[in-house]
Amino acid sequence: MLTSHFPLPFAGHRLHIVDFDASSFHEHDLLWLPHHDRLRSAGRKRKAEHLAGRIAAVHALREVGVRAVPGIGDKRQPLWPDGLFGSISHCASTALAVISRQRVGVDIEKIMSQHTATELAPSIIDSDERQILQASSLPFPLALTLAFSAKESVYKAFSDRVTLPGFDSAKITSLNATHISLHLLPAFAAMMAERTVRTEWFQRGNSVITLVSAITRFPHDRSAPASILSAIPR
């Protein structure tokens, strides 16, 4: 499959972005993935997206001296090496990944049309959040896409600690040209209730990318070895 990769410093991390041409995908492209058998029943588009995401993840891991391909967990989540946290996302013909010494979540979404934003808004935000989005200087479709993406990034950062929370479990409290703040409610995770999480964002073409990096650690989180931590951008 034809791909192009470039790293992009953002919010104290380095995003590894992979643009790919799904039409050039061939089944044998998957053979270098140790878990390729688990993708046998997936559709062609899904296989291409998965491959691009893992290519981005491999680039991210190599940056910290780790040569590995993240496997697939029981909940289809990426499995990262001990002591490292990571996140993968893809949309249309772009995939990206990020590695960190602390919990991290990244998401990329195509900016909604006006019609789609109007239709989906009630399922993503409440009336208070709508006022915040409308008070920003951003067009509503862009603002709503950011709200959706920010909540996705927060969920990814803590996916192993929460049980499929709804969009109403994290509320937008502020939105400006560079970041979004979200207030976590008990429905998100009791141990994280009433915390505020800051999500950084930027626009790339007709898509937005959001990233949350959280210093929160839990009893079973393992710290990365010093040799690895020293190589990870702060």
Swiss-Prot record:
Pathway(s) it belongs to: Siderophore biosynthesis; enterobactin biosynthesis
Function noted in UniProt: Involved in the biosynthesis of the siderophore enterobactin (enterochelin), which is a macrocyclic trimeric lactone of N-(2,3-dihydroxybenzoyl)-serine. The serine trilactone serves as a scaffolding for the three catechol functionalities that provide hexadentate coordination for the tightly ligated iron(2+) atoms.
Gene name of the record: entD
Family named by the database record: Belongs to the P-Pant transferase superfamily. EntD family.
EC id: 2.7.8.-
Protein name: Enterobactin synthase component D
Summary of subunit composition and partner proteins: EntB, EntD, EntE, and EntF form a multienzyme complex called enterobactin synthase.
Subcellular location: Membrane
One Pfam family, short name: ACPS
Cofactor: Mg(2+)
